[in-house]
Curated annotation (Swiss-Prot):
InterPro entries listed in its UniProt record: Ribosomal_uS15_arc_euk, Ribosomal_uS15_N, uS15_NS1_RNA-bd_sf
Name by which UniProt lists this protein: Small ribosomal subunit protein uS15
The gene coding this protein: RPS13
A GO molecular-function annotation: structural constituent of ribosome
Assembly notes: Component of the small ribosomal subunit. Part of the small subunit (SSU) processome, composed of more than 70 proteins and the RNA chaperone small nucleolar RNA (snoRNA) U3.
Location of cross-link Glycyl lysine isopeptide (Lys-Gly) (interchain with G-Cter in ubiquitin): K27
Organism, scientific name: Sus scrofa (Pig)
Residue(s) carrying N6-succinyllysine: K27, K34
Amino acid sequence: MGRMHAPGKGLSQSALPYRRSVPTWLKLTSDDVKEQIYKLAKKGLTPSQIGVILRDSHGVAQVRFVTGNKILRILKSKGLAPDLPEDLYHLIKKAVAVRKHLERNRK
């Protein structure tokens, strides 16, 4: 975050790990991770939600390092990818919510 009373803009960014190899302590194989992705996608979760669950619950920091593909590519190969891109879906959802709010709270 930037400073209010200084010209600096701050350095808030996420840093990728230096090593792009699978950690030695990770016991899941590529097929195990793919099965988890399929199972979570069938529940209706988005690719970013799947990544958060894999990171927090299963210890998979980067799916791409373990499987060789990103989550969305894995879902597309199985035919489980969402029909709208995730960012576009959330923009549409927000626009609908703003319209609904403006209809209710007209001056």
